[in-house]
């Protein structure tokens, strides 16, 4: 497909532009019936067009959501980390089904003193619809879920994740577990969230947590190499390790 080009674009190298707007992603899939093969914009194009046209994270969110509304969203459910030198946001988005242009989405700002993560599973549950400074969402994010039969409660109880990407045990053990290991490494609350990862409770982990100390670039790089070492999920000590240790 084709879209109209902007009058001005910005330099982009990798996943960052000249204003230090940075966008990362993980795919969570979500309800398969919401995929739309007729949309023009896939998540990768959405990232790079957003970077070409935005000077702040907030501006990137508006540009990205306007694009899918105008041209349609081709990909499955997606989690985006959208950052600039002053703010970090987590945005989650999923289509509306075959032939329906647009998407439902929500974006939540991560507090300056907190850390967050996503690992191929939708992580935004309840969000404050009245906090316009720290939360943005599509106007029909709740009403569309009601229309499809995914949710029938009151607005304050609405969970984007449960409505559009219901968890199963595999999602917890293979996706949410990676977020748990990150939180476990840098907070004292890891033991509180482990029962959720093990499927013993349905209380999800928070979207963000306050770490014990400010993280360095090296801290983040190290966690990208994490294999649950020294935790109950250590893969060298379970059946997945096979005969190797």
Q: At which residue positions do the language-model features occur?
A:
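Second-shell loop/turn segments in exported
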Residues: 33-37, 45-54
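Long, well-ordered mid-to-C-terminal structural blocks that present hydrophobic/aromatic surfaces
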Residues: 198-245
């Amino acid at each position: 497909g084709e879209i109209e080009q902007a009058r001005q674009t910005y330099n982009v190298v990798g996943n960052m532009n000249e204003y230090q707007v940075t966008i990362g992603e993980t795919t969570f899939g979500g309800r398969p019936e919401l995929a739309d093969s007729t949309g023009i914009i896939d998540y990768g194009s959405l990232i790079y067009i957003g970077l070409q046209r935005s000077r702040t994270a907030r501006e990137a969110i508006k540009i990205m959501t306007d694009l899918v509304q105008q041209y349609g969203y081709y990909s499955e459910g997606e989690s985006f980390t959208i950052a600039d030198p002053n703010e970090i946001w987590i945005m989650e988005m999923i289509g509306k089904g075959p032939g329906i242009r647009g998407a439902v989405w929500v974006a939540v700002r991560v507090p300056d003193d907190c850390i967050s993560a996503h690992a191929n599973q939708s992580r935004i549950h309840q969000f404050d619809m009245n906090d316009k400074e720290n939360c943005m969402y599509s106007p029909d994010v709740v009403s569309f879920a009601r229309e499809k039969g995914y949710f029938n409660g009151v607005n304050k109880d609405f969970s984007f994740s449960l409505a559009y990407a219901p968890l199963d045990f595999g999602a917890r053990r293979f996706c949410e577990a990676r977020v748990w290991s990150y939180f476990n490494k840098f907070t004292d609350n890891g033991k509180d969230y482990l029962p959720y990862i093990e499927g013993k409770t349905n209380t999800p982990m928070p979207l963000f947590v306050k770490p014990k100390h400010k993280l360095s670039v090296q801290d983040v790089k190290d966690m990208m190499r994490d294999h649950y070492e020294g935790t109950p999920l250590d893969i060298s000590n379970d059946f997945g390790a096979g005969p190797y240790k």
